Amino acid sequence: YRNMIGSLLYLACWTRPDIAFAVSELSRFVSSPAEQHMIAAKHLLRYLQGTKDLGLKYSQPKSLSPLDASNVLWGFVDSDWAGCPDTRRSTSGYVLMLNGAAISWKSKRQSVVALSTTEAEFVAASSLVQEVIYARRLLSNLGFPQTKPTAVFEDNTTCIKWAEGAVGGTD
């Protein structure tokens, strides 16, 4: 089971972001897997077999000019709230895109217990923003400075207002 999860983690990290959440959940049971965890892991392997033609596909942008609009970063972020029945911790997920392709993604259990959906979403959004800062610096060092703000797509309106500094308190 441990070797299987290690291989699945490799795939989730490098070529198959679509399995990141499932692998994250399965990896919680590496130290003491039950039969149901092995069944779920094998189900994930069958999914991979059936979708082996899927994966990240990168294409060259129309222009390699740093001023080209296609060289703009954008990200999507979401979170559940208290999704873990044992710890009541939430799970964050994000994907950072460049030229229509995912360049960074993560699905991870939050280290804090959020007291509201807004707080869980804000923790998730802050993780994405940290990754955006890193990616913008990296792209700038590679000669592709980001001249426009990075759009972050978030579905919780109170979280968006918090990020804009328009609200204090929780929902």
Segments from the language model and where they lie:
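Divalent metal-binding acidic/histidine catalytic loops
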Residues: 1-171
